[in-house]
Amino acid sequence: MLKTKRIQQIQEYVFEHESVSLDDLVSVFEVSKNTIRRDVQKLVDEGHIKKVYGGVAVNHVKLESFNERQTRNQFQKRLIAKTAAQYVEDGDVIFIDSGTTTLEMIEFLKDKSITIVTNSLDVIVKALPFDALKVISTGGYLERETQSFSSFNHANSVKNYNFDKVFMASTGISISNGVTNSSPVESEIKETVIKRSTKVFLLADHTKFDKYAMITYCQLHEVDYLITDKVDVSYQHYAKENEITLILAEE
């Protein structure tokens, strides 16, 4: 087996089992412990897994503050947002999720006559100067870490909306665990708006792939359009097999 293929399969195996011993990996992949150690170290260095006593475990993505995330990969996020905005048409009713990439869409939507429903404080503030944008807040209490509005009855505020398109953010994406999020209260509204939309767009830069957070709010095959800056070939194959339109944002 090729080294790159084996490392990918080790990662998937750890993701599936949450934590495994090095001896288990040696047995499953039929290679030496030294080989497993080298393969595991590569995955640790990339941040996908972490070492624990006697083995390895999934490196769950922690909930970072909005400001921490906003400064990362800013150029790529703007390209992705600009590409996503091209799919919005006058008259659309859309949902814009709380996220640093989805937030960037507002600049490219400001001249369109649309209705935006959002759980994001920053989307509301950024849209404020643009009269063409009708903005509806989902309400709830302000979760300062994500600068979004949340409540455990949050889904009730959007369960009767009929969205033309929803533009979703994610903490981590993987084929095995789907589209994930670190906030349980945010995840409920994400699940609901996806069910209420004609088309689901997922906006994510390359750093979000092969990671997952605490809550899966939808499976990857439920996404209609995946917009990113670059993606591994395994996701390209998955998109083709599941009729997901994969769009690479370019200048």
What are these regions (language model features)?
Residues L2, Q11-E12, S19, V125-E251:
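Conserved phosphate- and dinucleotide-binding cores of soluble alpha/beta proteins
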Residues K62, T101, V123:
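A generic "binding-loop/recognition-motif" signal
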Residues G99-T100, H206:
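Active-site metal-binding loops of divalent metal-dependent hydrolases
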Residues L2-Q9, F15-D23, V28, N34-S98, ...:
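HTH-adjacent hinge/linker in prokaryotic transcriptional regulators
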